[in-house]
Amino acid sequence: MTKGILGRKIGMTQVFAENGELIPVTVIAANPNVVLQKKTTETDGYNAIQLGFEDKREKLTNKPEQGHTAKASTTPKRFIREIRDADVDGLEVGQEVKVDVFATGEIVDVTGISKGKGFQGVIKRHGQSRGPMSHGSRYHRRPGSMGPVAPNRVFKGKKLAGRMGGDQVTIQNLEIVQVDTERNLLLVKGNVPGAKKSLVVVQGAVKVTQ
């Protein structure tokens, strides 16, 4: 069964392991989530729990939102996400999910929205090679061939310049270095997608390599 929690990316720092190794970590603030709904195979065709994170002013919510959260005896939430294949039987609607669902050393997947880079060329966006910069070359950072003459068109999927970033990205198999239950913090080894203060979803790894 998968387990998960919603949180906000705070930033990066570094901690020392017991053997003196310096470990770069990302700090994720995961205040208690509330189970808003349980979905089962019988009712919805799949198993999942719906989590709510961060309170939202009632003035900013509509009646369906208020009614949905009232069933869980809680206030309207700013972020609502589903954790698929979760332990539906072990959780009840209205129950809080805290950082202690994870333990130090566990392997997790972290999902977030990558930083937006704006309109970028093919070298930055797709990692293509540039042309010669001197010796009479007039080809430097352009996208290159658009394809053969015969179809007389550019095929769909051709890698060209365009807006970069702002996509949902999941980084898999990150290790939890520390769980701070007092301050509701998770310290995850390495970097996670997204800007500071952005929403991230931490879930148990689907492809554990240990």
Curated annotation (Swiss-Prot):
One of its GO terms (molecular function) is structural constituent of ribosome. GO terms for cellular component: cytosolic large ribosomal subunit. It comes from the Bacteria. One of its GO terms (biological process) is translation. Residues 125-151 are annotated as: Disordered. Keywords: Ribonucleoprotein, Ribosomal protein, RNA-binding, rRNA-binding. InterPro entries: Ribosomal_uL3 (IPR000597), Ribosomal_uL3_bac/org-type (IPR019927), Ribosomal_uL3_CS (IPR019926), Transl_B-barrel_sf (IPR009000). One of the primary rRNA binding proteins, it binds directly near the 3'-end of the 23S rRNA, where it nucleates assembly of the 50S subunit. Belongs to the universal ribosomal protein uL3 family. Part of the 50S ribosomal subunit. Forms a cluster with proteins L14 and L19. PANTHER family: 50S RIBOSOMAL PROTEIN L3, LARGE RIBOSOMAL SUBUNIT PROTEIN UL3C. This is Large ribosomal subunit protein uL3. It comes from Bacillus cereus (strain ATCC 14579 / DSM 31 / CCUG 7414 / JCM 2152 / NBRC 15305 / NCIMB 9373 / NCTC 2599 / NRRL B-3711).
